[in-house]
UniProtKB/Swiss-Prot annotation:
<dbReference type="GO" id="GO:0042593">
    <property type="term" value="P:glucose homeostasis"/>
</dbReference>
<dbReference type="GO" id="GO:0005739">
    <property type="term" value="C:mitochondrion"/>
</dbReference>
<feature type="modified residue" description="Phosphotyrosine">
    <location>
        <position position="67"/>
    </location>
</feature>
<dbReference type="InterPro" id="IPR029062">
    <property type="entry name" value="Class_I_gatase-like"/>
</dbReference>
<dbReference type="GO" id="GO:2000277">
    <property type="term" value="P:positive regulation of oxidative phosphorylation uncoupler activity"/>
</dbReference>
<keyword id="KW-0963">Cytoplasm</keyword>
<dbReference type="GO" id="GO:0006979">
    <property type="term" value="P:response to oxidative stress"/>
</dbReference>
<dbReference type="GO" id="GO:0006954">
    <property type="term" value="P:inflammatory response"/>
</dbReference>
<feature type="active site">
    <location>
        <position position="126"/>
    </location>
</feature>
<dbReference type="GO" id="GO:0008233">
    <property type="term" value="F:peptidase activity"/>
</dbReference>
<keyword id="KW-0278">Fertilization</keyword>
<dbReference type="GO" id="GO:0043523">
    <property type="term" value="P:regulation of neuron apoptotic process"/>
</dbReference>
<keyword id="KW-0346">Stress response</keyword>
<keyword id="KW-0472">Membrane</keyword>
<dbReference type="GO" id="GO:0005783">
    <property type="term" value="C:endoplasmic reticulum"/>
</dbReference>
<keyword id="KW-0072">Autophagy</keyword>
<dbReference type="GO" id="GO:0110095">
    <property type="term" value="P:cellular detoxification of aldehyde"/>
</dbReference>
């Protein structure tokens, strides 16, 4: 079986933990992860001034698709940049139309709203993004730490990054694969 493929879209202002933890966990699970810079291949300044080097530009990554999952990290500025990008919209619309998994964390789900993705789904966000996400009646809201509704997987924030990442692994590769990755991490149950 071919290995699963993930696209993580990295925008200026992305939340570091919500980017790096899912990338790390998915790679531990054998998922081929591409970290794509929204603005190109140059290092990206994240929300806490950590610089992350993307693997490639989003334009180049788009040509290498399709992906089994598209991941949107949070961070207020990062989510705003994702929300304003026509390329992100195109990728998300294509992912939704081909029934591929879309995963977003913290403020990241607001990009789903901006691009009209997953309307009717139950979602969660960072508490600070709830009002924005619920503007209109496009989604139902959950206070769960991770919420999966069909092919839309959302989570709350930096403190839920491991759970979010493991939920992506489980959705793509099964519970056994997620459990194998989780075991040596010494996570609190």
């Amino acid at each position: 079986m071919a290995s699963k493929r993930a696209l993580v879209i990295l925008a200026k202002g992305a939340e570091e933990m919500e980017t790096v933890i899912p990338v790390d966990i998915m790679r531990r699970a054998g998922i081929k992860v591409t970290v794509a810079g929204l603005a190109g291949k140059d290092p990206v300044q994240c929300s806490r001034d950590v610089m992350i080097c993307p693997d490639t530009s989003l334009e180049d990554a788009k040509k290498q698709g399709p992906y089994d999952v598209v991941v949107l990290p949070g961070g207020n500025l990062g989510a705003q940049n994702l929300s304003e990008s026509p390329v992100v919209k195109e990728i998300l619309k294509e992912q939704e139309s081909r029934k591929g998994l879309i995963a977003a964390i913290c403020a990241g789900p607001t990009a789903l709203l901006a691009h009209e993705i997953g309307f009717g789904s139950k979602v969660t966000t960072h508490p600070g993004a709830k009002d924005k996400m619920m503007n209109g009646s496009h989604y139902s809201y959950s206070e769960s730490r991770v919420e999966k509704d069909g092919l839309i997987l959302t989570s709350r924030g930096p403190g839920t990054s491991f759970e979010f990442a493991l939920a992506i692994v489980e959705a793509l590769s099964g519970k056994e694969a997620a459990d194998q990755v989780k075991a040596p991490l010494v996570l609190k149950d």
